[in-house]
Amino acid sequence: MSGETFTITIDQRPVDVVAGETVLKAAARIGIKIPTLCYLEKCGPLNSCQVCLVKINGRLVPSCGTVSEPGMSVESESVEVHEARRTALELLFSDHVGDCLAPCNRLCPLRLNIPVMLRETEEGRIQQAISTVFETLPLPGVLGALCHHPCEQGCRRGQWDDPAAIRAIEKHLADEHRQSKTPYIPSRKPASGKSVVIVGAGPAGLSAAWSLLRQGHSVTVADRHSQAGGTLTSVPPRHLPEEVLAGETRQLASLGLQFRFGSELGRDLTLDGLLRGFDAVILAVGGVTPAEAQSYGLESSSAGIKAQAETFETSRKAVFACGRAVREMTQVLRAISDGQSAATCVNQFLMGSPIRKTPKPFSSIMGRVGRTELKLFLRSTSTSSSTTPCNPSAGLDRREASLESSRCLHCDCRSSGSCALQTYAQTYGVDASRFRSQRRNFEQQVQPGGVIFEPGKCILCGICVKLTEIAREPLGLAFIGRGFNVRVSAPFNRSIEDGLRQTAEECVKHCPTGALSWK
């Protein structure tokens, strides 16, 4: 009867429920978050995505539409349930057409959000663009000068004419920052009370220092030379001006980095002595021989110091190694990335956490697109060819950087970072290609009012259809077709915008996949 209460158990935890209450709601009341893609309380259970599966009495059922019953025993976090949810997600990706991350972003080992940087530069929001760069890149001036820019190799604009000049734009932002009277200082966590010494002031060592300083640790860099930079100091000034490297050193000093020059490992420094004064040691000493590695008291490999590939740990506790001290490395970007990755592992060690490689952010990958599909991207971007700077030696000025940035195709998902499908794919370790068949064509419907509909990202959850029904939209949205050809659209071959006269904002807000977004 209405109002009757009884007890069920969820993951062996008792919870009192009211008759008619779903398992999903009961779980939420005791802090158990069951993933959902097709559930919005206002719409009620739609039972379409199957991501909210739980196990009850030996059966897998959707928790959003399963009503609690007296004595019910629910499993929501078992291995079997997790595997079922992962399979449900992988089935949704079997017909998913779109990238979570743009190819340029995926190919950057430092994970710079390049599309955001380009949009900010295009719109003249230079301080925001500088913030985007300086919150992500350890040595942006050096990278603007010397990066081998794998991002540009993956830029889809290059399939049409020329890729966006990403490195040149990054260089422009670094130059703007260096010339600013109020330089941007990256955010930093409160002091941790932990200290690290890095032996080697080359690109890997300086990158590791930048990352650890931002985690709140005290960092000292020791180097046998009289200035920071390592191999960077031998780069001809026409490729890396001295003021660029000096600016990077000042930036690190503003974060609190201490330098100890004229100190060489094996001559002035020993690991025993360093470990007495610091909580962890990173060796970024450049190329070393196996004999030199052994003289430090460490196991060696054919390349130098023997270190675990994913954790950078050496044979001695609290001693880590990265860069050319561990493996042959000729590209500055790789050395900087290596230092940053090593710093992540050292931070885990200092915080007492398990030391493991940072997982890459999940991204569905659409792959190479055809010319017809490229034209869809080009509709909302500049069709100009690549920008040639008026002063090639100085690089792009602000106007030229904006023009070049406007050539970005915006092929990243507008909902990346806030997309529930992407979030759960990361959480459950989804293999997006497990059930992948031949990809259907990419579609993008740009509406005059600013709504963008990408049918290839729609999972037919039904939320937008239900919201337009609840709001009594004059036209609304509906499921059109049958079987595998079902799609969401406005009736009578009208546009999506016609169906969202009153509910566009609400439908975009609650779309779980980015199929509906704002331009």
Regions found by a protein language model. Give the residues of each.
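Short secondary-structure capping/turn micro-motifs that flank functional sites
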Residues: 43-44, 228-229, 267-269, 484
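Solvent-exposed beta-strand sheet faces enriched in polar/charged residues
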Residues: 260-262, 480, 519
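Cys-dependent condensing catalytic cores that perform Claisen condensation/acyl-transfer
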Residues: 209, 274, 282
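Beta1-alpha1 glycine-rich phosphate/pyrophosphate-binding loop at the start
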Residues: 112-115, 121, 159, 163-167, ...
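A structured beta-alpha segment of the ubiquitous adenosine-cofactor-binding alpha/beta core
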Residues: 88, 251-277, 393, 397
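Conserved dinucleotide-binding and phosphotransfer motif residues
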Residues: 30, 215, 255, 274-277, ...
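Ferredoxin-type iron-sulfur electron-transfer modules and their immediate structural context
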Residues: 2-195, 247, 280-321, 325-510, ...
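Generic hydrophobic/aromatic pocket-lining and core-packing "Φ" positions
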Residues: 209-210, 271, 332
